[in-house]
């Protein structure tokens, strides 16, 4: 029997005529090879989720069309000289609306691990660092069949933070003890050259940036902005001179969880001064505390227009 000869159960009327917001597939893994001029290609194995809405007049979606659309778009991307994961998602949501003619809304998300090659700060040993990248896209179809697309690219990066509050307490305590046997001038000279202890956190910074379909954002830029927002980047391979450099630098740049989010805001505004005002960004920082059982959290969600207004104040 051909496909057309089998009954199409999905097209039947549902017994309960209620529309559904999202129906689709999750956890579809694909290999993507991103070509780079004069460089080795980047290999990603992202996991895709893909959904469409379902009207109240239809029993079910044609589920096989979703993984079929994912395979088609990924295969087409393999022949392109430059491709971004968020553009794959943007193309995918448009393809989903083509395949599901009854749908008015399509949404997809892709998550994967992105490997960055770097050198340790002093010994210059080669190391690979893993970051998580997230891409999403949403497509809407109006009454005339016109499709509009918004896409999002994001990164989640691990770094190190140092608590400013505890460090100031340690400095004050050290100063009081030094003044017991040193004069004020000598004590200040000691304080000026000593790096004071504090408690540390493993920080996890996230930027999710939503932009129009024709606007491109480099995920490497987002990764650097997140790294620079914390007290120090981290590195997988560290010899003792490397450890000393990272720990010293981090303690010379203490930041609260709130500071990290604000630093990311400034980094984005400086790197992308021409992004449209309606571009929406979500910035999150989670610091995994070393002296508490809880973690510290801060977040900012705003349009670029709003961020520009606040930064002028």
UniProtKB/Swiss-Prot annotation:
Site (May be catalytically important): 163
InterPro entries: GTP_cyclohydrolase_FolE2/MptA (IPR003801), GTP_cyclohydrolase_MptA (IPR022840)
EC number: 3.5.4.39
Involved pathway(s): Cofactor biosynthesis; 5,6,7,8-tetrahydromethanopterin biosynthesis
Catalyzed reactions: GTP + H2O = 7,8-dihydroneopterin 2',3'-cyclic phosphate + formate + diphosphate + H(+)
Keywords for the protein's UniProt record, in alphabetical order: Hydrolase, Iron, Metal-binding
Coiled-coil zones: none
Cofactor: how and how many bound: Binds 1 Fe(2+) ion per subunit.
Necessary cofactors: Fe(2+)
Gene Ontology biological process terms, A to Z: tetrahydromethanopterin biosynthetic process
MF terms (GO), sorted A to Z: GTP cyclohydrolase I activity; GTP cyclohydrolase IV activity; iron ion binding
Pfam families: GCHY-1
Assembly, per entry: Homodimer.
Function: Converts GTP to 7,8-dihydro-D-neopterin 2',3'-cyclic phosphate, the first intermediate in the biosynthesis of coenzyme methanopterin.
NCBIfam families assigned to the protein according to its UniProt record, in alphabetical order: GTP cyclohydrolase MptA
UniProt record similarity statement: Belongs to the GTP cyclohydrolase IV family.
Name of the featured protein: GTP cyclohydrolase MptA
Organism field: Methanosphaera stadtmanae (strain ATCC 43021 / DSM 3091 / JCM 11832 / MCB-3)
């Amino acid at each position: 029997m051909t496909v057309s000869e089998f009954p199409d159960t999905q097209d039947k009327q549902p017994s309960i005529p209620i529309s559904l917001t999202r129906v689709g597939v999750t956890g579809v893994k694909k290999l993507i090879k991103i070509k780079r001029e004069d460089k080795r290609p980047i290999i990603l194995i992202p996991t895709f989720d893909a959904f469409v809405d379902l009207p109240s007049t239809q029993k079910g979606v044609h589920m096989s069309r979703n993984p079929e659309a994912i395979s088609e778009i990924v295969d087409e991307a393999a022949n392109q000289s430059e491709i971004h994961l968020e553009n794959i998602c943007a193309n995918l949501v448009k393809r989903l609306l083509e395949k599901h003619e009854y749908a008015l809304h399509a949404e997809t998300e892709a998550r994967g691990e992105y490997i960055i090659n770097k050198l340790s700060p002093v010994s210059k040993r080669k190391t690979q660092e893993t970051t998580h990248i997230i891409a999403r896209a949403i497509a809407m179809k109006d009454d005339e069949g016109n499709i509009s697309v918004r896409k999002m690219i994001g990164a989640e990066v691990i770094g190190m933070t140092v608590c400013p509050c505890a460090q100031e307490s340690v400095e004050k305590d050290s100063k009081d003890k030094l003044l017991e046997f040193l004069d004020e001038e000598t004590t200040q000279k000691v304080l000026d050259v000593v790096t004071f202890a504090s408690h540390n956190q493993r920080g996890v910074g996230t930027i999710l940036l939503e932009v129009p379909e024709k606007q491109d954002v480099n995920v490497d830029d987002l990764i650097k902005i997140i790294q620079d927002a914390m007290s120090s980047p981290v590195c997988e391979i560290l010899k003792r001179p490397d450890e000393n450099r990272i720990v010293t630098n981090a303690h010379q740049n203490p930041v609260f969880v709130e500071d990290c989010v604000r630093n990311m805001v400034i980094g984005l505004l400086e790197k992308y001064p021409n992004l449209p005002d309606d571009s929406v960004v979500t910035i999150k920082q989670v610091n995994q505390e070393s002296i508490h059982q809880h973690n510290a959290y801060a977040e900012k969600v705003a349009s670029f227009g709003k961020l520009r207004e606040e930064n002028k104040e």
